[in-house]
């Protein structure tokens, strides 16, 4: 959980170990967020979440999954243009 004085990450990447599509998505999200100045974090769906329960039931068959501002924006093969558009849309609403 991020410290209370820092905003939550705008982009969340849900992954699992040994997933080659997750490796590709991580590289894409890292690059796009760096270029756009957006925060991001990665969540392993096989590890216990904040409530102690892994997220594998919700995300397991879809990984990698990208959410921007809490909205699912892609899964399996992540589209860079959709991620950028979601970040731009969120910035306009701020």
Placement of each model-derived feature along the sequence:
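Thiol-based oxidoreductase modules, predominantly thioredoxin-like and allied folds used
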Residues: 38-50
